[in-house]
């Protein structure tokens, strides 16, 4: 199975399945001399881990990360960093009844078509459980980018179903179980989630992730444009069906005179481009949105076929998220951090000595 690695100089390779013994990853390209402990990684893992509220899956995994290599006496050595998280709360028996069925909306059918077999326990490698290691690796990138360049990466839920959520207060995001930046909508989200759990159904969501403090110059035209790599990274997250950079699909409504981000001595007058022009960071805030589909693991009966080609009705039992968008927030942050870290290293390798007299804001 290929496709387990992202990045060129800052490289993250993950392994493991939902109901396997453990999840792990190898992080290559981490600069030496960075203070790093397991506690530095645990904060974001705790934000992502299951079972932390009644609105997410009740699979209870502590997600305690272990640093196996690449750190000596509390600092990175420049060698590969090995990370491991043990699975402790698998309930594989929940999936015995569907081992021969293809869950509609899941990767069961496509995995079996591709490989001729599949791990039916919790989706195996296709499960979002794999993203725990992305978050751990992303925490390394976030720490370095913040300490070295003052870059702040943060995300929030900006829509659930038909409820839009304005970014009113970033401080509120960590104060509620929805990563919601609009305190006036918490009750509406709670009511929606309670109704979904009662019905045994699920709902889609939109997540926004931003990076402040990114300097101009990151991105490798033409095929490794910064926005192309960000879209690639975000699109690789489970359940993501759409990615927008800046205004995204809203630009189809605008005229060129409205969409262009005009520049004065005071700086850019707007940011429709989401901080990226020509595939290169402009120095403005980088903004990306992702759309996540409603999970298909629901107790509402649905139609499918089994491995023998017979039509059957099925209900997906187990412990699942009514809205996968909630726990996607720290995952999106991690993927943006990984891409920015990789492009920082690539920029430094080729253009580390480049200086200009062009203003920066």
Swiss-Prot record:
Transmembrane regions listed in the UniProt entry: none
Superkingdom of the organism of origin: Bacteria
Catalysed reaction equations from the record: 5-O-(1-carboxyvinyl)-3-phosphoshikimate = chorismate + phosphate
Cofactor dependency: FMNH2
Binding site residues for FMN: 125-127, 238-239, 278, 293-297, 319
Any Gene Ontology CC annotation: cytosol
Parts forming coiled coils: none
InterPro entries, per database record: Chorismate_synth, Chorismate_synth_AroC_sf, Chorismate_synthase_CS
Cofactor remark: Reduced FMN (FMNH(2)).
Gene Ontology terms for molecular function: chorismate synthase activity; FMN binding
Subunit structure: Homotetramer.
Name of the featured protein: Chorismate synthase
């Amino acid at each position: 199975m290929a496709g387990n690695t992202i990045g060129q100089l800052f490289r993250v390779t993950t392994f493991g399945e939902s109901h396997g013994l453990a999840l792990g990853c190898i992080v290559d390209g981490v600069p030496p001399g960075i203070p790093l402990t397991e506690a530095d990684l645990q904060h974001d893992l705790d934000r992502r881990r299951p079972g932390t509220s009644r609105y997410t899956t009740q699979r209870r995994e502590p997600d305690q990360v272990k640093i196996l290599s690449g750190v000596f006496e509390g600092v990175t050595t420049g060698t590969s960093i090995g990370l491991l998280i043990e699975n402790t709360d698998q309930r594989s028996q929940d999936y015995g009844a569907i081992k021969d069925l293809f869950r509609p909306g899941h990767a069961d059918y496509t995995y079996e078509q591709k490989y001729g077999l599949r791990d039916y326990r919790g989706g195996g490698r296709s499960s979002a459980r794999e993203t725990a290691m992305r978050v751990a690796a992303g925490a390394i990138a976030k720490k370095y980018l913040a300490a070295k360049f003052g870059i702040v990466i943060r995300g929030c839920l900006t829509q659930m179903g038909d409820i839009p959520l304005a970014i009113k207060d970033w401080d509120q995001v960590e104060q509620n179980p929805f990563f919601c930046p609009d305190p006036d909508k918490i009750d509406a989200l709670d009511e929606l989630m309670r109704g979904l759990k009662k019905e045994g159904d699920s709902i889609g969501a939109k997540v926004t992730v931003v990076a402040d403090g990114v300097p101009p110059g990151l991105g490798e035209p033409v095929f490794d444009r910064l926005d192309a790599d960000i879209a690639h990274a975000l699109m690789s997250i489970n359940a993501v069906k759409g990615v927008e950079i800046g205004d995204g699909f809203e630009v189809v409504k605008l005229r060129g005179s409205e969409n262009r981000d005009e520049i004065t001595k005071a700086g850019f007058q707007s940011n429709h481009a989401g901080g990226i022009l020509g595939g290169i960071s402009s120095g403005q805030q980088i903004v990306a949105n992702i759309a996540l589909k409603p999970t298909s693991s629901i107790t509402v009966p649905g139609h499918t076929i089994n491995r023998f080609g017979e039509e059957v009705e099925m209900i997906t039992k187990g412990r699942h998220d009514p809205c996968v968008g909630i726990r996607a927030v720290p995952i999106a942050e991690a993927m943006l951090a990984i891409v920015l870290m990789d492009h920082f290293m690539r920029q430094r390798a080729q253009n580390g000595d480049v200086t200009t007299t062009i203003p920066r804001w």
